[in-house]
């Protein structure tokens, strides 16, 4: 397993890809596999950890040379495994060119913009490419997608409250497409208090917060910082609903799944993978406009919170995710390109 080098596995706070990698590791181990993970040196996932970069060089997402160094050393180190599962952007393109590399399965966690299409169109010649949602796969164009494997969680890791509190919660990055500013307007429209927990480490995130979000805060809309671990889950479990007014075709949306695992209904835009995760009228409501989301919030107490948790357990378990990837690992080892 090759994780990006920027954050530990699992991440201490925000870090969707790293949380998914941790889940895959645990699911595979339950299925009886031995797992090696190339990752950030502070990683604590239950597997053999191999790290190739000192701590001081990691932590700033997007430094190309840092990721390249991590990827090359990871591939050169992993000659003793049966198959490599790569979660980086650079790895699927350059890693298989290293001598003696095992078969490669690659998962793309982002959008298929033009640059990523060019990368994965070429990488697909020698790797099994996996999409994380039908929506993401549909956006890939002529990129050769081998399969779709949804993310999974273990609901036993998530707290559950039969009756939610009186507040709504927003969780995500502090960027325009995640919609924190929309969340405040929608919550205020129906008179429901809102708590916002969001990643705000990079300069563009801080600039957006100061310009578009901070002026809207007040007694009914509170920014509580970036939360991780139990603090994040307790906030989710105690909420009346997760408000997710995204402005983009999100490839998956892990926060929606985490919310359902806590038994908290989701009210959000019907964009990207949201319809694959949220059963409209069953575990939440999806709409297109702020007015539609506001109207949905008026009905959110009709949603059975236990049904939300059961939905996550039955449709998005670690076991289902691990099984999906096991199938791709087997296909990769049988592929004549791996010979």
Predicted segment positions?
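Catalytic cores of nucleotide-sugar-dependent glycosyltransferases that transfer UDP/GDP/TDP-activated
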Residues: 1-339
């Amino acid at each position: 397993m090759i994780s990006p080098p920027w954050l530990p596995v699992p991440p201490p706070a925000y870090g969707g890809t790293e949380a998914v990698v941790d889940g895959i590791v645990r699911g595979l181990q339950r299925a009886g596999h031995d797992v090696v993970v190339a990752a950030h040196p502070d990683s604590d996932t239950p597997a053999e950890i191999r790290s190739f970069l000192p701590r001081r060089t990691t932590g700033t997402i997007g430094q190309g040379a840092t990721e390249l160094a991590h990827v090359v050393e990871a591939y050169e180190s992993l000659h003793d495994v049966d198959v490599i599962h790569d979660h980086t952007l650079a790895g699927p393109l350059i890693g298989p060119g290293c001598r003696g590399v095992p078969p490669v399965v690659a998962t793309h966690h982002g959008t298929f913009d033009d640059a990523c299409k060019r990368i994965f169109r070429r990488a697909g010649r020698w790797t099994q490419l996996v999409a994380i949602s039908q929506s993401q796969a549909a956006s890939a164009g002529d990129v050769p997608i081998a399969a779709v494997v949804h993310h999974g969680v273990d609901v036993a890791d998530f707290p559950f409250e039969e009756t939610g509190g009186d507040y709504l919660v927003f969780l995500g990055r502090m960027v325009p497409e995640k919609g924190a500013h929309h969340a405040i307007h929608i919550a205020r429209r129906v008179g429901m208090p809102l708590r916002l927990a969001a990643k705000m480490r990079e300069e563009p995130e801080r600039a957006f917060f100061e310009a578009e979000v901070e002026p809207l805060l007040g007694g009914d809309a509170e920014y509580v910082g970036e939360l991780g671990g139990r603090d994040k889950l307790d906030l989710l479990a105690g909420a009346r609903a997760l408000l997710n007014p995204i402005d983009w075709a999100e490839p998956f949306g892990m926060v929606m799944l985490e919310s359902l695992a806590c038994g908290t209904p989701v009210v959000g835009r019907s964009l990207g993978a949201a319809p694959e995760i949220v059963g409209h009228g069953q575990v939440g409501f999806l709409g297109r406009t702020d007015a539609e989301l506001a109207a949905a919030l008026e009905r959110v107490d009709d949603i059975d919170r236990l049904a939300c948790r059961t939905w996550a357990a039955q449709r998005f378990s670690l076991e289902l995710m691990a099984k999906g990837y096991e199938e791709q690992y087997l296909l990769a080892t049988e592929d004549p390109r791996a010979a």
